[in-house]
Amino acid sequence: MDGVWKALAADMHRTFSAAMTICAIIKPAKTIYKRSDIMAFKEIKAEELTWNPFTQIGKGWFLVTAGDEKASNTMTVSWGGLGVWWGKDAATIYIRQNRCTKEFIDAKETFTISALPESYKKELGYMGSHSGHDGDKWKACGLHPYPVDGTCGVAEADVILVCRKMLQTKLDDKTFLDPSMKKRWYDGKEAGNFHTMYIGAIEKVLVKE
């Protein structure tokens, strides 16, 4: 009888071990977006960038992204600047109060700026004219967040700048020296919806290989 119990116990042990092995194999893994055609980035120095900021920002546009691997949002921006602030390579962006991305930027210490190829102009247009409050813009556009240093860039980008916030300040009625700009950009349905200016130190520059 003891032999029967020993044999049964051995069979149960083998069955349990096999089940655990299968579970280990099929257990969902924490996935980081991977595609060989858009994931090959290398790090360069900021001064090695060959951008013309006037054409890249004003005409080419870029995506500002904040959040992390679990949750993030991005939006198209055509106002901003690149330069040096407090002795650091820096980027300046402007975000209106009602944008979903602003909530992510305010909640984190870092954000990214991503420049995409011209072929993504349609997607950039969508990202700028729709809000993350109304749905998943990543899914709607077919773009993908690219986790980097605790924040997210855009996987399809040619260039990603990882920035750490140094300063933020909200524009208001008192900051305008040219009243015509306030009337043009902050009147009608945008009355009171002023931009917040963020200046971020550029901590990393990634370019597609």
List where the protein language model places each region:
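Intrinsically disordered, low-complexity segments enriched in serine/proline and basic residues
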Residues: A9-A10, A18
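Short, Lys/Arg-enriched N-terminal segments with co-localized hydrophobic residues
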Residues: S17-I38
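Basic, polyanion-binding surface patches
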Residues: K34-E209
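Intrinsic-disorder-associated, low-complexity terminal segments enriched in Asp/Asn/His/Tyr and depleted
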Residues: D2, D11-H13, Y33, D37
